[in-house]
Regions:
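Short, structured patches in soluble enzyme cores that scaffold and shape functional sites
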Residues: 57-59, 67-69, 90-92, 100-102, ...
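Acidic (Asp/Glu-rich), glycine- and aromatic
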Residues: 106-114, 119-144
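Long, intrinsically disordered low-complexity tandem-repeat segments
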Residues: 179-234
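Hydrophobic/aromatic beta-strand elements that line small-molecule binding cavities or substrate pockets
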Residues: 53-55, 85-88, 113-117, 145-147
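Well-ordered alpha/beta subsegment
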Residues: 87-102, 106-117, 306-314, 318-322
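A structural signal for small-residue-enriched, beta-sheet-centric alpha/beta enzyme cores
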Residues: 129-176, 231-322
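N-terminal, charged/glycine-rich beta-strand/loop interface patches
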Residues: 1-102, 107, 292-296
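Small-residue (G/S/T/A) turn/hinge positions that recur once per unit in extracellular repeat modules
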Residues: 61, 94, 109, 122-124, ...
Length: 322
């Protein structure tokens, strides 16, 4: 099934909304701006399903995108694969918040996801990706995801995620040398400065090979990666990372603006942006960690001239580390 979504927003109005099964959508009012709520209108994602999502925000407009339920990549038992392709243009001064429910990679799935974000001057985006590795008692299938972000035509973030079904064990006994995450996760290169800067970060899956059994909320704590931006899957970020027993993974990006406060598990990009990583054994644990930081990202994204209150940042630190 080839389905999808096309959205055009001008100011606070959704002026174009076109959907094709298995996607349906409804426009709702929201405090952030209009909310496009995505609803499943048919079974999916099944083998052969390909979804194309196109979002266009006019200068100064705002949009929030949510889903009513998790997106499930079902087993591709007879071959084939599933795919979701998202392409967003965020005009000058416009604001986009992409906040879907988790993506669940079932056993036997083969899924490819590609996201391209094009930000004009002054545009800001909060982008959330949450991944659940298999249903209860399952080993996740294969998931390949790619995120490419450009700000004013120059690269801001390049990130890849590859989860191999046979090589990933998310059961309770998983430990050591788990080649769960591989691929580039890089910032730059067009913006001056190192690709990633900052001290060692706990709670962030650092790409590389290690033999360890991670504790809750921590994959690998390692030193900051400094130097010019990295291009290509073999230039320093090509090794496997340890996910271990964590079945729930989230990436939260603030793009077009940096967080002014230190947030656990977050890294500043070379350009204007902050990215945060979270791992958890349970879905509610991950939701709590993300929920402690997401409002701060939305606040900065919504009103970049309003400084982030200190106590809010402190509460985020406490929640992430509990």
């Amino acid at each position: 099934m080839n389905g999808g979504l096309e959205v055009r927003v001008e100011g606070t109005r959704v002026v174009r909304l076109v959907t094709a099964p298995p996607i349906a959508a409804k426009v709702l009012p929201g405090s952030f701006g209009p909310v496009v709520m995505l609803v499943g209108s048919a079974a999916g994602l099944l083998a052969g399903d390909r979804l194309r999502i196109r979002i266009d925000l006019a200068p100064g407009s705002r949009l929030e995108v949510r889903t009513t339920a998790a997106t499930i990549a079902h087993p591709c038992l007879a071959g084939g694969a599933t795919a979701i392709d998202v392409d967003c243009h965020v005009g000058a001064g416009a604001v986009l918040a992409w906040l879907p429910e988790p993506f669940i990679a079932c056993a036997g799935c083969r899924h490819q996801g590609r996201v391209r974000l094009h930000l004009d001057k002054g545009a800001r985006v909060v982008w959330l990706d949450t991944l659940t590795l298999g249903r209860t008692g399952e080993t996740a299938g294969r998931v390949d995801q790619r995120l490419d972000v450009e700000l004013e035509g120059r690269p801001l973030l390049r990130e890849g995620l590859c989860l191999g079904g046979d090589s990933l064990d998310t059961g309770a006994g998983a430990a050591g040398d788990v080649p769960a995450v591989a691929g580039p996760a890089i910032a730059g290169p067009a913006i001056a400065g190192p690709a990633l800067v900052g001290p060692a970060i706990a709670g962030t899956a650092l790409v590389g090979t290690a033999r360890t059994t991670p504790t809750a909320g921590t994959a690998i704590a390692g030193p900051a990666i400094a130097g010019p931006a990295i291009a290509g899957p073999t230039a320093g970020w090509d090794g496997p990372a340890v996910v271990g027993t964590h079945r729930h993974v989230a990436a939260l990006h603030l793009l077009g603006r940096r967080m002014p406060a230190e947030i656990p598990g977050a890294m500043q990009l070379a350009g204007p942006g902050t990215t945060a990583r979270f791992l958890a054994h349970r879905g509610d644990e991950l939701a709590r960690k993300v929920g402690a930081v997401l409002p701060l990202f939305l606040q900065v994204c919504s009103d970049p001239d309003d400084p982030l209150p200190g106590p809010a940042g402190e509460r985020a630190k406490e929640a992430v580390h509990v």
